[in-house]
Amino acid sequence: KDLIQEGKIKAWGISEVNEDYLRRAHAICPVTVIQNRYSMMARWHEHLIDVCQELRITYIAFSSLANGALTGAYHSQADFKDDQQDFRRNMPQYSQTGMIKTNALLEVISQVAKKYHATNAQISLAWMLYKFPHLIPIPGSRKVDRLSSNFQAGNIQLLETDIQMIDHQLEQMEFEVFGGH
């Protein structure tokens, strides 16, 4: 708080925060931004989005494509075997069991993507932006064309019926995903 008052910093944020810690920290010095995992497959912090709106805090969602799983580009941990530095090699969403669960969701996303002539990633991001317009997703991208494609998700206006269908399916699904609680 002193650093803000002295003009040494303009704002501050917290990463991977829970509601109790956020409220306690915010009471001492108003938090400007939080950064937590959030995607169709990782929704355990969803209640924090409402808390952030209540407290006027920006929510930045990292891993918004579940470390690439929601793109449909990867099919198993073997997709990462040639890159020993790629930490996704050990993520549960790419295990045999994890991929079965992920593929069930990808079927739903692909169905909607075809309707909008969009990619799976674009639909995943458009869903997130529709539900929480004040949330800022930061999908990781290693290639410029994917970055550009992801950016176009903001131009996709999903219909309420598509959102309801996706949400209905998500309510019936459980995922094995990195960072899960």
Kindly label every feature range from the protein language model.
Residues 1-180:
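Beta/alpha (TIM)-barrel catalytic core signal, keyed to glycine-rich beta->alpha loops juxtaposed to Asp/Glu
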